[in-house]
From Swiss-Prot:
It comes from Ajellomyces capsulatus (strain NAm1 / WU24). This is Mitochondrial thiamine pyrophosphate carrier 1. The gene is TPC1. The chain crosses the membrane at residues 15-35, 79-99, 125-145, 182-202, 218-238, 282-299. It is a multi-pass membrane protein. One of its GO terms (cellular component) is mitochondrial inner membrane. Belongs to the mitochondrial carrier (TC 2.A.29) family.
Length: 324
């Protein structure tokens, strides 16, 4: 890293940026996988925790809080239960990270060629929002598979990644791989815009602090992520509820997931049956996960990119990697 002197769009050539972004996604995903499984389980849980009478007809587990859910999954499904969906998730994060960072760099550089340059926060917001939309759309089927695997209990619906792709294609068609995609894009565009704008704004002042192991990047990533995640969380929950729709809906760990159709109608249904709190189920673990995930992602990205630049790894593009 340049000690805050360079912005993300000014660092490294295209191949170095893709490699660093993919590596950052891989490392980040493995570290936070258990929290991601917990978040998905809590988001898919529809019954009231404060009303014991609503639990009478429930056949699956009842999760209460992050630690309790971690213990329950570990007890009932073993240590591997905390990494369910990790294979499609690793593929997702590798592809997503590479596409996201390379798109961010390309869009930022393009915006800087405008006759009237945009203010840095505006440029960062637009670049982050568009890059997030591109990366989300490109990798969405992997995101859906990750959710479905994480939602499985001991009675598996899909035996492997290959089987899941085959079964969804056969029973749901191409549309099945994009259930909830509208909510995902509606969520990720403002999220990544807020995240990158916040990260760029915080990166320079935090980089001037004497922090161990060069953790200024991590600190900026944590703060930016918490702010952005809280703002768009209801759409993340809606996306998860829509991703498990279809013929397998009643076979997941939560067998009482209602039928949902469309983002707007899903939000209305959740508000009607669970109130505003229903849109924020899993927020606590989501924020707990978002902080280390973003910290690890940005720290890994900056340091891997710095290592690649020092090693002159990758092809220099456009006269030394200065352009796109």
């Amino acid at each position: 890293m340049s000690a805050g002197g360079e912005h993300l769009n000014e660092e490294g050539n295209r191949i170095q940026v893709v490699a660093a972004g993919a590596t950052a996604g891989l490392v980040s995903r493995f570290c936070v996988a258990p929290l991601d499984v917990v978040k998905i389980r809590l988001q898919l849980q529809i019954h009231s925790l404060s009303d014991p009478l609503s639990h009478r007809d429930i056949k699956g587990p009842i999760y209460k809080g992050t630690i309790s859910t971690l213990k329950s999954i570990f007890r009932d499904e073993g240590i591997t239960g905390l990494w369910k969906g990790n294979i499609p998730a690793e593929l997702l994060y590798i592809c997503y990270g590479g596409i996201q960072f390379s798109s961010y760099r390309a869009i930022s550089s393009a915006l800087r060629t405008l006759p009237h340059p945009l203010p840095q926060p505006v440029e960062s917001f637009i670049s982050g929002a568009v890059a997030g939309g591109i990366a989300t759309t490109s990798t969405y089927p992997l995101d859906l598979l990750r959710t479905r695997f994480a939602a499985q209990g001991n009675d598996r619906i899909y035996a492997s990644l290959r089987v899941s792709v085959r079964d969804i294609a056969r029973t749901e068609g191409p549309h099945g791989f994009f259930r909830g995609a509208t909510a995902a894009i509606a969520q990720i565009v403002p999220y990544m815009g807020l995240f990158f704008a916040g990260y760029e704004a915080l990166r320079s002042p935090i980089a001037s602090l004497e922090l161990p192991f060069g953790t200024g990047d991590a600190g900026a990533g944590v703060v930016a992520s918490v702010i952005a995640k809280t703002g768009v969380f209801p759409l993340d929950l809606v996306r998860k509820r829509l991703q498990v729709q279809g013929p397998t809906r009643r076979r997941y760990i939560h067998t009482n997931i209602p039928v949902y159709e469309g983002v707007y109608r899903t939000i209305r249904a959740i508000l009607a049956s669970q109130g505003p709190k229903g849109l924020y189920r899993g927020l606590t673990v989501s924020l707990i996960k978002a902080a280390p995930a973003s910290a690890v992602t940005m720290w890994t990205y900056e340091h891997v990119l710095g290592l690649l630049k020092d090693m002159n790894c990758g092809d220099d593009e456009d006269d030394g990697g200065g352009g796109i």
